[in-house]
Amino acid sequence: MIAYNEAEKIDAAVSSVLWADEIVVADSGSTDGTAERATALGARVVQIPFQGFGDLRNKAIAQCTGDWIFSLDSDERCTAPVRDEILALIANNPPSDVYRVPRRSYMMGRWIKGSGWYPNFRQPQLFKNGAMRYTLEPVHEGYENLSGKPIGVLANAIWQFPFRNIEEVIHKMNRYSSLGVPKIAHKKVSMASAFGHGLWSFIKHYIFKKGFIDGWAGFVIAFGNFEGTFYRYAKRYEQNQNWQPPQSEPLRRENR
C-alpha cells in the first residue's frame, strides 16, 4: 500500500486487509500522522521518497516477503467477497500468477456506473512475488507481466473512494497534469491543441463512456478529465515558451 498524507483514509484501507499475513505501507514523508496510524493498526511502514509512482510501487513490493502480493491504494477498500476469492484462489494452484481486480468507485454520494469507472481497472493488483513489475512513468504507470502466463481477472470488486470532495478533484488534476508533462515532451503543442485534447477527454468520458448517466457526478468526472488533460498540455506549452517577466529598474526619488 502506498500513501502520502492520507490520515483520513489509511485506517479504513489497512483495516480492510487485516486478514493478510503482513501489511506493508510505503509512506512518502507524510506529515499528517498517516504513518503513525498505519503502524498502530499493525502495518509495517517503510519510508520511500517519491520519485514517481512506478518507482514507488516497485520499491514497495520489494519490501514484501509473502509468496503473493495484493496491492491496495489508500483510497481503496478490500471487500469480503474479494478477500474470500483471493484466499481460495491462492490456496488452489491458480492458472495465472497475475490478476486484475475490478473496482467500484464512489463519488458525490453515489456509486458511479458510467465514465468508464465501472468496472474500473488499474494495473494488476494481485500477483505472485516476482511475477510483475511496474514501468517507471511518473504517473499512470504501466506494468510488465514477468510470469509468462495469461493475466487473470477476479470476479468480485474492491471499493474505491477517489475523492472526498471537489477540492481533492482539483488538487489531483493539478498534480497529475504536472506529473504527466514529461510524457508529452516529444509532442508539438499549442494552447489550441491543449483545449482540443481537453475537450476530447470531456466528450469521451461524458458521452462515449456514458458519464451523463451519473448526473452531476458524471459531469464533474468528465470536467476533471478536461482540466487534467488541458493543463498537462498547457503546462508543456508554457515550458516551451519559457516566458520571463519584464525586468524593472530600481526606482529612486528624482532630484528636483
Q: Locations of the language-model features?
A:
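Short, well-formed alpha-helical segments that are part of the catalytic scaffolds
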Residues: 1-22
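Acidic helix N-cap motif at the loop->helix transition within catalytic regions
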Residues: 8-11, 32-41, 81-82
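A conserved acidic beta->alpha catalytic loop
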Residues: 16, 27-37, 73
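Short, structured coil segments at secondary-structure junctions
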Residues: 19, 40-42, 122, 147
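Short, well-ordered alpha-helix to beta-strand connector turns
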Residues: 20-21, 42, 64-66, 96
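Conserved donor nucleotide-binding strand/loop of the catalytic core
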Residues: 35-63
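Catalytic-site signature of metal-activated, phosphate-bearing donor transferases
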Residues: 54-61, 68, 72, 79-243, ...
